[in-house]
Amino acid sequence: MRFSRRDGGEGAMTSFVFYDTETTGTDTAFDQILQFAAIRTDDNMRELDRFEIRCRLLPHIVPAVGALIATGVSPRLLTDSTLPTHYEAARQIARKLADWSPSIFLGYNSMSFDEELLRQTFYQTLQPIYVTNTNGNTRGDILSLVNASTVVAPTALTIPIGTSGKPTRKLDTLAPANGYAHSNAHDALADVEATIFIAKVIGRMS
């Protein structure tokens, strides 16, 4: 997968930033980020840098039990005083993403969830909100590439069958079905690594 960057002309090196969040729930207007992870790569998806941070629970947030079970986050970890506050974590995330700009920001199902939650986090903590699509940055969603590949390159990926008997494109089942040992699903950094793996599989078929 190669792109020309808008500020550098044809042939300029593009960097991708693959990122993921683990949260207290699925409501992007209410829930908060508990873990953020990102890996920056070159245009051949070779790793250049990585970043990961966890933070403490905000006092007004009631986490969903299902989210804690899925992520394996214990009540003790939620209030661990050695972790940064939500505000401190947001500042570090914003600073790192700014340092990595301009880039193409990518996630898995990120456009409908992680992207919205990240913007809400930056809004709440007085950080620049539209980091991923301003100042030369662009964004995308690897799930959209997965959906497109099933039409234009149906043999590129093995699409597993879920418990309902229907095809599923959830990352924690898609990655193993295509040969990736995704043993730590719903850890933000592990999910980023799995997302890069899927992107590479699609890239080899492009």
How would you label these PLM feature ranges?
Residues R2-Q124, T168, D172-N178:
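Conserved non-catalytic scaffold segment of RNase H-like nuclease domains
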Residues T23-G25, S144, A194:
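Short, glycine/acidic-enriched loop or turn micro-motifs at the edges of active sites
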Residues V73-R76, D80-T85, P128, T150-V151, ...:
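A broadly used, surface-exposed interaction patch
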Residues R95, D99-P102, Y123-Q127, L145-T155, ...:
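Alpha-helix capping at helix-to-loop junctions
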Residues I104-L117, A153-S206:
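Acidic, Mg2+-coordinating catalytic module of metal-dependent nucleases/exonucleases
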Residues Q120-T134:
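A short alpha->loop->secondary-structure connector
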Residues T134-I161:
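Short alpha-helix plus adjacent loop in nuclease-associated cores
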